[in-house]
Amino acid sequence: MARYTQRPENALKRANEFIEVGKPLRALDTLQEVFRNKRWNYAYSETVIEPLMFKYLYLCVELKKSHIAKEGLFQYRNMFQLVNVNSLENVIRGYLKMAEEHTEAAQAQSSAAVAVLELDDLDNIATPESILMSAVCGEDAQDRSDRTILLPWVKFLWESYCQCLELLRVNTHCEALYHDIARMAFQFCLKYNRKSEFRRLCDKLRKHLEDICKSSNQTTGVSINKVETQQLCLDTRLYLLDSAIQMELWQEAYKAIEDIHGLMAMSKKTPVPKTMANYYQKLAMVFSKAGNQLFHAAALLKLFQLTRELKKNLTKDDLQRMAAHVLLATLSIPLPSAHPEFDRFIEADKSPLEKAQKLAVLLGLPQPPTRVSLIREVVRLNVPNLVSEDFRNLYNWLEVDFNPLNLCKRIQSIVDTIEASETENTLLTPYIQSLKDVTIMRLIRQISQVYESIEFKRLLELAPFCNIFELEKLLVESVRHNDMQIRIDHQRNSIYFGTDLTESQREYRPDGPTLQSMPSEQIRSQLVNMSTVLTRAVSIVYPNRERDQRAKLRSQMVQHYHEIKDREHQRILQRQKIIEDRKEFIEKQNNAREEEEARRHEEESRKAKLAEQKRLEQEQEERERKRHENEIQAIKEKSLKEKVQQISQTAHGKKMLSKLDEEGIKKLDAEQIAMRESEELQRERKELQSKLKSQEKKIDYFERAKRLEEIPLFEKYLAEKNVKDKEFWEATEATRIENAIAERKDAVSQQERLKRMYPDRDEFLEALKKERASLFVEKLKKFEIALAEERKKRLAERVVRRREERRQAYLRAKEEERFRKEEEIRLAREAEERAAAEARRLEREAEDEKRRQQYEKQRAKEEEAERKIQEDRERLAREVAVERERSEKERDVWRPRGDRSERPSAAPAGGASEWRRNAPTSDRNDRNDRNERNDRSDRNDRNDRSERIERSDRNDRPERKDTDGGADSSWRVRREPVEPQRERGGGAGGGPSGRDDKWRRGGDRSERLGGDRDRDRDRDSFRRNDGPRRDDDRGGFRRDDQPQRDTGSNWRDSPRQNDRDNRDNRRPAGDRRDIRGAGPKEGGGGGGGGNWRTAPSPRDEKPPVKRDQPQDKENKAGDDGEWTSVKRR
């Protein structure tokens, strides 16, 4: 499988490798992964992607994968439609060219296959198989071959054209390419005679044009308002019209004409005359094929007018030929019906008038033409004088002269002339039959004006080119449309005209030559004629009566005018004023409406911008979400593909994957695939073991049985083999002995023959040794000298070589020693660093463990203190409620809480019980009385608990020494940095606990009560006594300062203080807002009256010792613990 993310260059190289080994599908998958990967799509230029795209499309064409090619083309369009349109155009043209080449090759292959089949057997051309096949399917060999070989490629080419048109339909940069491909598709339909595909192509182009007309606001969209776009669309529709006419698809041709007319009407530029001439010519042809002679003649007349006006180099022969064509087409129009409204009772869809009006719009006519109007227009244009003498006579005979006895003979001579010269009058031949029908109708009408009755035989003699059946049909049609009054008597074989005087032929004068009116016409107009004659007679008998009546009427009119002229003048003035007022009112309304419309438009535009911005933001969020999902999905798919690729490399993995399809693999993840792989592996192992066991048992039984059966056969075979081997050995040995004896004899005879040559050999050797002795001695001396020199040279080289080897060995040893020392130093340094890191780690772990233990202790203390305080508060709340009821019953006089005269001075720095005894009669007095009645055992327990907490704090952290008296040490560790807190005033809960918990609460409410002077005084006291302030000292005042701050009485603070006290009693004990008012219940100070201006300075009193305030410590611990628990919640 292809890797998930490959660079385009690598993908192209890998695809070429797959193609070389004969795996085009793998190559296509590799390239397809690149286009599906959004990572590389927009990171490379067309020089890198274009070769990849050509290879991709080549593989799609080879494998006939049109849908995969469509996906790649759309991706490529999105990448380069705004960057490099030429690259996109080259890619699309190359793709279509490859598809066309393969289709043409398939067509040639199909023809060649048929030729081979036809020439296979010249002696037996019609085989039984071919005869049966032609009888069954009715197709010849070429059709079957085309269906098998050519048709798949034709389908692929058609899909390619459709995909490219869909790809480029909304891109203004590729508009010319779109129309070129449309023309190529038309040529394809013509070449392969694909009529159904041509209809679908026309519908597709019409749908594209409608989409362009509907929406033209896109960035790369095609605008129909541009002149270039309109011209391209017009040219394409004209080409479509030509193709439809060639394929004889007249319905599609008519739709194309409607599209062309719409484009010409939409265009601001007048179409060129050549285009209009082509349009009228094709329109006339379509009307002719549709059998609509009236509009066919009208289209030819428009073409004649256009050509005559705009074509300057028109010859006389061309003008005469065109005029004859127009004149004959106009005269061939069937005579109209007298009452066409009868057709509306027969038609099922639209009325004929609506259809005619629609067709007249295509010709640019204000109203539908008629035969009379066309003949009148022909005469106005002087067409009869432009044609030859024969056609001029034809017009006169049909429309001017009244000669029924010779009419058909004259027309027949014209018809013979047209038929005789077919080469020159090819365009006029289709009008012959229509011309004959019109001639017969003219003959019948003229005969009806001359004769009351006539025989069939005589009428057929007057109409030689018509038989009796056609004549009777025309007579019935005339009666059906109420053109004439005709009665046929078959018994006498005669025809009667105008016998019914109660019926009229028509209400207007008929067209054509007329001799006289019919009797029914005369009867119908008799009353009109009588009225005319009587009026003329009265005017003759009384010539002055009419003049007197006119004079009298004139005098009455003048008198009436003088009577009403003033009133009428005032009415006119009043009307003029009303009109002016109305105009002003309408103008104001229009201005107001325009302003309102402008405001509304502005508001709508603003809302649209906001909606668009919101939509863009939503789309951006949606894209980001989809991108994130796609990335996650891509990671999963990558992991899955890697796992599948890894599994597919094994035999059992391939077997497991073959059982799953692509959808099944996509539904699984990597773990499930691995699990199935292991299951498949285990199953294969079990199957293999069982097969091996059964095979082993089978082979064991088979071998044992085989060997038992082979024993007697082997014994018999061995006995026979021994006998044969003995015989063979004896024969071979005898042959060997004979050969050895013969060789011995030959060797002895050879030796005896050569003994006589020994003396000559010895003499030759002795002579040769004597001759070569001196030469041998000389060469031996030279060799010894060269040997000595070579020995010296090699000894010197060995000395130099050994010296260099010793030097290199010394350098290597020295370098190794240096490396060894550096390595020892490095190892020692690393050991020291590891030891230091280990020590730091152990130290951090010890500190973390110690901190955790301290936190555990602190948390246990806080939970215990919080639980106790909560119990005390609940109990105190119950007691407060009881005491309040009792005090309300005993109280005699109501007195405001904030009275300055009854507000006591600040409580001394003693315990909380003494402060409660000196408090005024109020809710605070009730609480002090209630606290005195508390159980002594509970107070002792709290004191013991406070002492234990203090001792543990002292042991855990060093005590912080403050010179301002009495602020106990804080054992809490600040969990997060906070902003500098403001000091708490002397309100409720203003004890020492405010210092440690303010960073959690974000400030104290009492700060708003105390004012700036309290803050300045407190700030000065801290600076004088505490030295530099730290972050953990920015809380409220210390508990030993609180009684001093509460001294005096301030009437400004008393309402708020009273409300706060009441609020403390109303709120439940567990409420978070109750924390601020919980201080005074068990702590010293806070909430009492007193004036802050008269309060003594904190440094005037000696701060009490910490151990003298166990109750304060308990309050602090409880308060901080509660706020700590709130923070944790």
From Swiss-Prot:
One GO biological process term is: regulation of translational initiation
- Kindly give the Pfam families that the UniProt entry links to this protein: eIF3a_PCI_TPR-like, PCI
Cellular component, GO, one term: eukaryotic translation initiation factor 3 complex
**Which compartment or compartments is the protein found in?**
Cytoplasm
Please explain the role this protein plays, according to its UniProt record.
Answer: RNA-binding component of the eukaryotic translation initiation factor 3 (eIF-3) complex, which is involved in protein synthesis of a specialized repertoire of mRNAs and, together with other initiation factors, stimulates binding of mRNA and methionyl-tRNAi to the 40S ribosome. The eIF-3 complex specifically targets and initiates translation of a subset of mRNAs involved in cell proliferation.
Q: Give the similarity note.
A: Belongs to the eIF-3 subunit A family.
For this entry, the protein name equals Eukaryotic translation initiation factor 3 subunit A
Q: Which organism is it from?
A: Drosophila mojavensis
Lineage per the UniProt record = Eukaryota, Metazoa, Ecdysozoa, Arthropoda, Hexapoda
